[in-house]
Swiss-Prot record:
NCBIfam families: prfB. Peptide chain release factor 2 directs the termination of translation in response to the peptide chain termination codons UGA and UAA. Keywords: Cytoplasm, Methylation, Protein biosynthesis. GO terms for cellular component: cytoplasm. InterPro entries: PCRF (IPR005139), Pep_chain_release_fac_I (IPR000352), Pep_chain_release_fac_I_sf (IPR045853), PrfB (IPR004374). This is Peptide chain release factor 2. Gene3D superfamilies: 3.30.160.20, 3.30.70.1660, Release factor (1.20.58.410).
Length: 372
């Protein structure tokens, strides 16, 4: 085996050992055994929220273990591939070496992706995520763009097998949505998706413009950690106003004959949340309260960061203003304005292929944190 290949495999092995150490594989196996025991309990589903947390954590832990074990197996197979290739002659040798090199490159990419997971060590990174998307400047194009972003994130979750629960969708009059709120219900969803916070910009020929002019649209993405009991986010009934109304669909059309949709106003802060996607008023109120608690937790975190001078002007601009540009005309490119990571296939990105952006964003966040 060529010395450069041997050195590269040694580097891969060292990186993978770091990943295995950070994830604590033996502890992961122990936790899986514990969760499997809980999942087998016939009384588990007496508490549906707890049951969903158990099954979600179990599925995530099993997936993590499978990924690491698969990476280790592939790394152990690589020297064999090179040995077999070097035993060939002529064109067969060339083809076999190219195959081994391709697998080594693919393994590099997969190990680096797994390494990114070890960077999620923030206080709330392990939580499930609440994602809020709001249309911005750009009229009907912005509403359509907000719906495209919602579809992008849901397809990303589907690619990974992450459950998604849509809490609320406020449809625009002509097309698209004014806003939407949904939960990505898997461990580390918040740590992963929080790098997507900010303003997303779309440039394209407007399908709603009879003259076929180019239009720039904006939509805002907010990502919040799901609140847990340990956060002690109490919301007294005296601090909220609850309004009920009929659920509506595209174009404002009523889709329910009963007042099942719920709007909750938090009187001290003025925060308003709505939920209309559940079947009953009670279910919608429970979901809306979860969103309100998440927003209050984020408000509390912002106040704490402000006190610690963590929300400096440069960081605030990074997250609050444009963070990614999607250009469909006159050329095709999606570019992250913080990391400079870019791809020339917007169609794939809008269909949920955003792992490259997320991974580069997590690394960027780590560098920014270390520099501050």
């Amino acid at each position: 085996m060529h010395p450069d290949v041997s050195a590269d495999l040694a580097e891969l092995d060292a990186t993978l050992k770091t990943v295995e150490s950070v994830l604590d594989i033996e502890e992961l196996r122990r936790r899986i055994d514990e969760l499997e025991h809980q999942a087998a309990d016939p009384d588990l589903w007496n508490d549906q929220d707890h049951a969903q947390r158990v099954t979600s954590e179990l599925s995530h832990a099993q997936g993590e273990l499978r990924r690491v074990e698969d990476l280790r197996r592939r790394l152990e197979d690589l020297p064999v591939l090179y040995e077999l290739a070097e035993g060939e002659e002529g064109e067969a040798r060339t083809a076999a070496l190219e195959e081994a090199d391709a697998e080594r490159a693919a393994l590099h990419s997969d190990v680096e992706a797994m390494e990114v997971r070890t960077l999620l060590s923030g206080e709330y990174d392990k939580r499930e995520a609440l994602v809020n998307i709001r249309s911005g400047a750009g009229g009907v194009d912005a509403a359509d763009w907000a719906e495209m972003l919602m579809r992008m994130y849901i397809r990303w979750a589907d690619r990974h097998g992450y459950p998604v629960e849509v809490y609320d969708t406020s449809y625009a009059e002509e097309a698209g949505i004014k806003s939407a709120t949904f939960a990505v219900k898997t461990p580390y969803a918040y740590g992963t998706l929080s790098v997507e916070m900010g303003t997303h910009r779309l440039v394209r020929i407007s399908p709603f413009d009879n003259q076929g002019r180019r239009q720039t649209s904006f939509a805002e993405v907010e990502v919040l950690p799901v609140v847990e009991t340990t956060d002690h986010i109490e919301v007294p009934e005296t601090e909220i106003r609850v309004d009920v109304y009929r659920s509506s669909g595209p174009g404002g059309q009523s889709v329910n004959t009963t007042d099942s949709a719920v709007r909750i106003t938090h009187i001290p802060t003025g925060i308003v949340v709505t939920c209309q996607n559940e079947k009953s008023q009670l279910q919608n109120k429970i979901s809306a309260m979860r969103v309100l608690q998440a927003k209050l937790l984020e408000r509390k975190r912002q106040e704490e960061r402000a006190e610690m001078d963590a929300l400096k002007t440069n960081e605030g601009a990074s997250w609050g203003n444009q963070m990614r540009s999607y250009v469909l005309h006159p050329y095709q490119m999606v570019k992250d304005l913080r990391t400079n990571y870019e791809v020339n296939n917007p169609s794939a990105v809008l269909n949920g292929d955003i792992d490259g952006f997320i991974e580069s964003g997590i690394r960027w966040r780590m560098r920014e944190s270390q520099a501050s």
